[in-house]
Amino acid sequence: MSELEKVTAVDTTYDASEIQVLEGLEAVRKRPGMYIGSTSSSGLHHLVYEIVDNAIDEALAGYCTDITVTINDGDTITVTDNGRGIPVDIQPQTGRPALEVVYTVLHAGGKFGGGGYKVSGGLHGVGASVVNALSEWLVVQVHKNGQIYEMRFSRGHITQEMRVIGTTDHTGTTVTFKPDPEMFDTLVYDYEVLHTRMREQAFLNAGLRITIADKRPGQEQGEAMCYEGGIREFVTYINRNKTPLHEDVVYLAGTKGDSTAEVAIQYNDSYNETLVSFANDIHTPEGGMHETGFKAALTRVLNAYGIKYGMIKEGDKISGEDAREGITAVISVKLTEAQFEGQTKAKLGNAYIRTLVDGIVSDQLAVYLEEHPVVARSILDKALTANRAREAARKARESIRRKTALGGAAMPDKLRDCNENNPELTEIYIVEGDSAGGSATQGRDSRFQAILPLWGKMLNVEKARADKVYGNDKLQPVITALGAGIGEDFDPLKLRYHKVIIMADADVDGAHIRTLLLTFFFRFMRPLIEEGYVYSAVPPLYKLSRGKQQRVAYSDEERDAISAEMRGGNPNVKIDISRYKGLGEMNPHELWETTMDPEKRTLRRITLDDAVHADATFTMLMGEKVEPRKEFIERKAQYAVNLDY
């Protein structure tokens, strides 16, 4: 691990005097959402992140090189690191072993007061004690001082006092826990979710080896990840399905006092900006001062270079938007006393980090461009092309703005609006085809359900510049009906419906339309997905009939179960089973009963847990490169169902 990636501890001792106690643990089980966000699958996975964050704190301090995360049979989790081991001596404030304090007292840890760690992540340092409080049981073993210490807990209470169970020739901590079924909606861990997070952490900490293993029977898999190139390799990974404009990943880094900043940049031939930022290894999706400093410096440096070499006239400078078209950049800062806005740490507030990042990018990127004129020209050419297209896009956006301002008068001809005006109570079905749109219009509850049929070939926005998207006649009705604008003008507060439901056939064509719409929402109306307004309707696949009795099934398994139920134990009873080819085959009553009635329907909310992964997936599915798409199809073919027959 290079010196840049390390932030050395204040001193090399790590004992009980570094553990500070701030408050008790009583509230965690009463209000778990305050500490881990939710008790859904997201919160379940957050337990793992909290323990891993503690191990990464040791890595940031320069004392840990290996972390292993294991999903055990029964969905218990084991996290092992080779750091110094949690202190086991007596903690001065409490007179109890520090290990006990760390796992039973909220806000007890070496990350407070500046004594144990200069740099630390975690959710406000609640870490180990919150995981303990929300676990049915937890066992922690510490290898330290040549001995193995062990403690056991249940729902935050001690079930076995700290004791020595053996000797050891190494140091580190191993934690195994089982989430409490009383606290969580699900106890099943998703390997891909954990794998993605661990890979991200390995990229952010150059040279740190993170291994993930799934030991559940029938699901065995795993990977050891170690990236000596750090965030440079992260950028290469993000761009793997894109065509880079230049081979090198530009790497810029610097230190001021106890703070470090590093930036990795590579442009590609797409029209999308992918900017991913972190503070103390915590993703900051809403940006903050580090992003502000980067953006300002990037635009300033490109303009200065362009003016110096006659590519840009003094009065025609490129904008920040132009400068970032096609960029993939990762920004990672490590700092003491990080100030995050909000409990979710979505935005970094430390003002001095802006100056640090701005200075690094200003100085080092200017030198890089001078030394690599071919790369500089390719970046400037792309920015200038974006600049020329921006004016056309601006005019198209202005047109949309004017239409949106007119409200109902500007609504699309094919929109069948609802009577209710309160967006919190309304929903819009975006439906494939006029025939399905007709059935949906007749079958809906017009008090709160609006219908917008789509027809013709829809634009693949992954391959189109913004001005083409803004002016597209197939997307205009969607933009206008939703009423919240597009691109940088998009404002969720202006949404006319708080449920945007994509209703398409359960076949290949329907899947394609869903993907095209989701790509559009992701690239040009991302808050729509981020704030949970987008849904996918789930129409039935089968109709089963026995005389006058009729049932519908939404999967092959449900079809078989209903068929057996309708036979009533008599295998000779004939059940007529027909597969719905499309939404247009259903009459209005059937469509209402199966797909639109809020009391009976199934809706799938589209969520965005990992923007980097989503970005790569949309590029792979809808971008120019065929080979990654082919590999994806071949890899996933075993899980596919027969969509067309």
Language-model regions, residue ranges each:
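Helical (often loop-to-helix) elements that flank the catalytic cores of nucleotide-handling enzymes
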Residues: 92, 341-354, 552-558, 562, ...
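Short conserved segment of the HATPase_c
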Residues: 86-109
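C-terminal interaction appendages of subunits in large macromolecular complexes
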Residues: 388-407, 422-427, 438, 442-444, ...
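Residues immediately C-terminal
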Residues: 57-58, 85-86, 508-509
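Conserved short strand/loop->alpha-helix "switch" segment adjacent to the catalytic nucleotide/phosphoryl-transfer site
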Residues: 30-49
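GHKL-family ATPase ATP-binding module
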Residues: 1-15, 25, 49, 57-59, ...
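Mature N-terminal segment immediately following signal peptide/propeptide cleavage
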Residues: 17-30
